[in-house]
């Protein structure tokens, strides 16, 4: 199945929003149990194999982060919102200075993306090692543990922060009807080059179309994007 082009924002009307909302709601209600079982099996096998095969890389990154700042933690965790608005603790390699959250309030006016997200290409809170692991998406690898725990799936919408969800419309919240993922249609379609509205549309498109083969296609495209990617920050 080919990844379809993004729905243009100019084409999105109230009627089309209602139509998409109805289709997403119907899709999440009618999703076959067989698909969900296969998806969970893929998640467990994929995450376990990923942790095992990538363990040397995980060790190297751990050492680099520790050498950069011996007193700071290697891992960073944050409360995120998952399926049906249930919160969970999401893990990442720390890519910012330890007091990054305290510094955020002074940077909010420099947000480079519209909507309920914060993105800044030259964020001063990012460390030198952090810049590399963000560019290659290596900072996301600890989320494989979230997949094993069942908080996340390998493929699904990006898990938002509670403060982001507080700004969501009822339409935006449709993306919370499925389990969030380590990667998804948004991530392989432009990621930080896309607006918040475009991210929502891509997530809803994924929910409408999701199946085993579509998931595998997104995983394959993610693996290719991790090598030489320059749109992650």
Language-model segment annotations:
Residues 13-18, 75-124, 183-201:
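Short, glycine-rich, amphipathic interfacial segments at transmembrane boundaries or analogous
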Residues 116-178, 218-226:
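A short, structured surface patch at a secondary-structure boundary
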Residues 30-100, 218-233:
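A hydrophobic, helix-centered structural microdomain
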Residues 1-52, 173, 206-208, 230-233:
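N-terminal hydrophobic signal-anchor/signal peptide
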Residues 37-41, 53, 125, 137-140, ...:
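An acidic site on a long C-lobe helix of protein kinase domains
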Residues 45, 126-129, 201:
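Residue-level signal for cytosolic alpha-helical hairpin/rod architecture
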Residues 165-189, 193-218, 230-231:
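Cytosol-/stroma-facing membrane-proximal "stalk/adaptor" domains immediately downstream
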């Amino acid at each position: 199945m080919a990844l379809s082009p993004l729905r243009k924002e100019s084409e999105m009307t109230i009627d089309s929003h209602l139509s998409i909302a109805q289709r997403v709601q119907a899709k999440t209600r009618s999703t076959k149990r067989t698909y969900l079982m296969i998806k969970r099996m893929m998640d467990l096998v994929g995450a376990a194999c990923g942790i095992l095969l990538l363990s040397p890389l995980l060790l190297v990154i751990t050492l680099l982060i520790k050498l950069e700042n011996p007193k700071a933690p290697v891992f960073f965790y944050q409360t995120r919102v998952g399926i049906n608005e249930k919160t969970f603790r999401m893990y990442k390699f720390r890519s910012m200075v330890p007091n990054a959250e305290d510094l955020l309030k002074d940077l909010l006016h420099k947000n480079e993306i519209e909507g309920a997200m914060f993105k800044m290409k030259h964020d001063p809170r990012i460390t030198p090692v952090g810049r590399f692991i963000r560019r290659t998406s290596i900072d996301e690898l600890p989320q494989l543990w979230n997949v094993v725990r069942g908080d996340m799936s390998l493929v699904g919408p990006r898990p938002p922060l509670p403060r982001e969800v507080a700004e969501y419309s009822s339409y935006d919240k449709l993306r919370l009807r499925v389990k969030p993922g380590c990667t998804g249609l948004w991530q392989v379609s432009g990621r930080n080059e896309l607006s918040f509205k475009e991210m929502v549309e891509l997530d809803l498109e994924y929910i409408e179309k999701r199946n085993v083969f579509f998931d595998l296609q997104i995983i394959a495209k993610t693996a290719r994007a991790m090598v030489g990617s320059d749109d992650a920050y």
